[in-house]
Design a protein with these regions (language model features):
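Domain-level signal for soluble alpha/beta catalytic cores
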Residues: 1-166
Length: 166
């Protein structure tokens, strides 16, 4: 599908419905668990996509309805990252109060595709093109505390981090 020269789109994130999550600063706290949460996330994703179609966007996103924040949903697919025992860090790009971040505790290695199923579900909701937002190496570095590599360049350039399926 050919996009117009200037495509109307959204940054990716879309407001989560109050029945799905309570939003606290830049994090969502989901109201459900297990199968009920997945069903609610599917519903919220479909709602987000259909709303984007209705308002006339050309390039749609899944609305990031499955994410508690920008990086944790993606990082859950990698070994070497502790999402359970966060530590407080001042995040440079946000220039704000210190906040809890995941810890890098070992070699980062992809154990499973991070967003393939999310993309498949989103694509099944529309005939329009879908984009998926993923954090790059610098966002991951800034949004985690490195307790393993001790070197931001080494962490960013680790080949196993770039093990992305083609």
């Amino acid at each position: 599908m050919q996009l117009p020269s200037i495509a109307a789109t959204t940054i990716g994130s879309f407001p989560r419905p109050s029945w799905l999550a309570q939003n606290e600063r830049s994090r969502a706290v989901f109201r459900l668990e297990g199968a009920a949460l997945k069903e609610a996330q599917d519903d919220a994703t479909a709602l987000s996509i259909h709303t984007q179609e209705r308002i006339g966007l050309d390039l749609l996103s899944d609305g990031e309805q499955r994410r508690t924040g920008f990086i944790n949903h993606i990082l859950a697919a990698f070994e070497g990252i502790d999402l359970e025992h966060e530590v407080v860090k001042t995040i440079y790009r946000r220039r704000e109060q210190p906040r809890p971040v995941p810890r890098v505790v070992g070699k980062i290695k992809r154990r499973a595709p991070a967003i393939v199923e999310d993309l498949r579900f989103a694509k099944a909701q529309t005939n329009k093109p879908i984009k998926m937002d993923v954090p790059g190496p610098m966002t991951v570095i800034d949004s985690t505390l490195d307790e393993f590599y001790k070197d931001e360049v080494a962490m960013a350039m680790d080949g196993s981090c770039m093990d992305v399926p083609q």
